[in-house]
Amino acid sequence: MTFRFDNSYARELEGFYVDWQAAPVPAPRLLRLNRGLAGELGLDADRLEAEGAAIFSGKRLPEGAHPLAQAYAGHQFGGFSPQLGDGRALLIGEVTDRSGRRRDLQLKGSGRTPFSRGADGKATLGPVLREYLVGEAMHGLGIPTTRALAAVATGEPVLRQAGELPGAILTRVAASHIRVGTFQFFAARSDMERVRRLADYAIARHYPALAEAPEPYLAFYEAVADAQADLVARWMLVGFIHGVMNTDNMAISGETIDYGPCAFMEGFDPGTVFSSIDLQGRYAYGNQPFILAWNLARLGEALLPLFDADAGRAAEKANAVLGTVGARYQARWLEGMRAKLGLAGAEEGDLSLAEDLLAAMQGARADWTLTFRRLADAVTEDAALRPVLQGPDTLQSWLSRWRRRLGPEAARRIRAVNPIYIARNHRVEEALAAAHAGDLGPFDRLIGALSDPFTERAGLEDLAQPAPAGFNEGYRTFCGT
């Protein structure tokens, strides 16, 4: 099996990683191959079906692979950890896809590395399939994301608090795995030469036009801020909660990365938290835009000496960029909300129109996804929103204001941007429970729906329905991969 590796990170950034090998596993078995993604990468899916168990378990890596564990630091729940790094993952190499984009291939759950900090470096079946599924859901929604190329069962039990669980390894594809925390690792050691080298590499890889900018490092900071503001706005528009927005989980590329305790909100409440470790609600749904700015401030601190030799001027330049983050986010969010509402053009009252609907939704704990989807029917039917929203008098007033702002073919345009299918928590859990019992049918069915979430299909009605009453109130997610 031929992989056309061109491993620029290993070649150009020696000292930013540790060469390492995957731990041996007893009986690797390919559970699922993302054939569509394999095609995008220029790989032979049929051959991968035959050889993938050995390749994607790390047992027999292709020629040209260069397995390594990347170094990074990070703020975790606000506290700084100067050394984190890939504790259970190995970057095995980089390939160029059919569109000419450089993509990382990484094994997650491949065993201990020098960054494991006492952990076993393994992953279990449930979290691996969960990341596979949610990544594909985000891709289907058009949100920048890492994706899973393959899931492999290792054939070995992995000891966790709940007992022995089946081991698994995920092959993750990403634009890169450069994180805010990668810069922090070297900045914390006052190694500004390596911070500069990393910035040069990141610019060349992700934002090559900026190399000619008058102040390329400041332009890079602004580009990352813009990409992340766009990303978080997209999360908010679909009700996605990342769950662990630590700086080591923020990618410079602007992709969603590290699907640990993530989940989709159903009943609208800005305070929604599902993560079992987010006891204070730091990463609640409604806090995500604020954490976006907080994390970008930490990136600015790491890059500060690159902005100007004078510390005062450097801080002024960083703060000038940081001061725009809220406006960047709000502009992207409002643009997306106009699309969700089917509005024609842009008018000054659009923000209040959106906020009034959200207030009604919050009061009723209305299902985020179904409410916006049903707006398509509400274009002509007053009763369309009543199953999800209370207060018909208030609703009628809002409907009148909203309808005056609608453009042509509003119902079609609303359906085109508001999904009917999301990775609802109870359906994800059902699919994972079935997989643990040896049945991947529900997983495949859910993936099939989520790959085209805007098209309603007969036979999938159950996947569009909210969880049973009370399910999400007690639902908790965990960091598994």
UniProtKB/Swiss-Prot annotation:
EC number of the protein: 2.7.7.-, 2.7.7.108
Cofactor or coenzyme needed: Mg(2+); Mn(2+)
Top EC class of this enzyme: transferase
Keywords per UniProt: ATP-binding, Magnesium, Manganese, Metal-binding, Nucleotide-binding, Nucleotidyltransferase, Transferase
Reactions this protein catalyses: L-seryl-[protein] + ATP = 3-O-(5'-adenylyl)-L-seryl-[protein] + diphosphate; L-threonyl-[protein] + ATP = 3-O-(5'-adenylyl)-L-threonyl-[protein] + diphosphate; L-tyrosyl-[protein] + ATP = O-(5'-adenylyl)-L-tyrosyl-[protein] + diphosphate; L-histidyl-[protein] + UTP = N(tele)-(5'-uridylyl)-L-histidyl-[protein] + diphosphate
Residue sites binding Mg(2+) per the record: 249, 258
Binding-site residues, ATP: 85, 87-88, 108, 120-121, 172, 179, 258
Pfam families reported for this sequence: SelO (PF02696)
Family annotation (InterPro entries): SelO
UniProt superkingdom: Bacteria
Active site: 248 (proton acceptor)
Sample GO molecular function, one term: AMPylase activity
Similarity remark: Belongs to the SELO family.
Function: Nucleotidyltransferase involved in the post-translational modification of proteins. It can catalyze the addition of adenosine monophosphate (AMP) or uridine monophosphate (UMP) to a protein, resulting in modifications known as AMPylation and UMPylation.
The name this protein goes by in its record: Protein nucleotidyltransferase YdiU
Species the sequence originates in: Cereibacter sphaeroides (strain ATCC 17025 / ATH 2.4.3)
